């Protein structure tokens, strides 16, 4: 089988996406080492990878050039690690909710996030998220930066968990067309 430069580029994009798993693992290690700042730095780098890998994949045409690899599944697995598992562990490990809720809230986050990830209507045709999009990494970052009270954190987690099932539109920071000029990166 002949491999051309387009196939190599497609595999390179998949490898770049896959680097998010390594960054997520490093965030996990930082959490277990009680290094909150380090864990957020690793998750921040993973977020940057996630923010540009889709654009690269579309530009390179990975679906055509590497048809046996499913970049959407790869991205979803890594997103679940970095947007759900690591933040839920942070809530538990760094005691961000009141005593007695430290196991319940991460379990709630896992459950509602599983729904988010299997919901085929999670993204609208105009690139919004329908329902809270399971960006728990951002939520936990706000808890950390604002040094919010454990009870406030608990209430926020419950509200966002409920909003997962409410058909309200949430802005996708990179792809929504109507607010594209206000978002971090422009879709090329």
Question: Model-predicted segments: where are they?
Answer:
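Juxtamembrane loop-transmembrane helix junctions in multi-pass integral membrane proteins
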Residues: 4-11, 34, 66, 70-73, ...
């Amino acid at each position: 089988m002949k491999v051309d430069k387009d196939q190599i580029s497609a595999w390179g994009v998949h490898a770049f996406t896959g680097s998010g798993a390594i960054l997520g693992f490093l965030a996990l290690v930082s959490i277990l080492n009680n290094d909150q700042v380090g864990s957020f730095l690793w998750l921040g780098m993973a977020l940057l990878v996630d923010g540009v890998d889709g654009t690269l994949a579309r530009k390179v045409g990975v679906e055509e050039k590497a048809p046996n690899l499913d970049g959407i599944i790869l991205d979803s697995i890594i997103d679940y690690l970095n947007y759900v598992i690591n933040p839920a562990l942070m809530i538990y490990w760094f005691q961000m909710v009141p005593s007695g809720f430290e196991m319940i809230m991460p379990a709630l986050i896992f459950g509602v996030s599983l729904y988010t990830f299997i919901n085929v209507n999670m993204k609208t045709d105009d690139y919004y998220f329908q329902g809270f999009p399971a960006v728990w990494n951002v939520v936990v970052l706000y808890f950390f930066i604002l040094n919010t009270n454990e009870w406030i954190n608990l209430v926020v987690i419950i509200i966002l968990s409920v909003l997962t099932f409410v058909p309200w539109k949430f802005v996708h920071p990179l792809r929504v067309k109507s607010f594209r000029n206000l978002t971090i990166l422009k879709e090329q």
